[in-house]
Amino acid sequence: MAKEELVEFGGKVSEVLPDNRFRVILENGFEVWAYSSGRLKKNRIRVLAGDRVTLEMSPYDLTKGRINYRHKS
């Protein structure tokens, strides 16, 4: 998939799940499943419940996303 086809959303992590997955509530109120991007894993950036994040999602499946940025609090 080309990077131009991804849709970006902002949200807040509501729950941390096993295996580096998260439940995120988007700014529009929807709740989605998300996982950490490779860059976050490589740099050991911890994502905790309550953190504001930016997600990349495929326009074909808006129930799952990839966290690509954790905003500074």
From Swiss-Prot:
SUPFAM superfamilies, per the entry: Nucleic acid-binding proteins
InterPro entries, alphabetized: NA-bd_OB-fold, RNA-binding_domain_S1_IF1, TIF_IF1
Keyword rRNA-binding: yes
Keywords: Cytoplasm, Initiation factor, Plasmid, Protein biosynthesis, RNA-binding, rRNA-binding
Pfam families with a match to the protein in the record: eIF-1a (PF01176)
Gene Ontology terms: cellular component: cytosol
S1-like domain span: 1-72
Subcellular location, record wording: Cytoplasm
Function: One of the essential components for the initiation of protein synthesis. Stabilizes the binding of IF-2 and IF-3 on the 30S subunit to which N-formylmethionyl-tRNA(fMet) subsequently binds. Helps modulate mRNA selection, yielding the 30S pre-initiation complex (PIC). Upon addition of the 50S ribosomal subunit IF-1, IF-2 and IF-3 are released leaving the mature 70S translation initiation complex.
PANTHER family, alphabetized: TRANSLATION INITIATION FACTOR IF-1, CHLOROPLASTIC
Protein name: Translation initiation factor IF-1 3
Species of origin: Cupriavidus metallidurans (strain ATCC 43123 / DSM 2839 / NBRC 102507 / CH34)
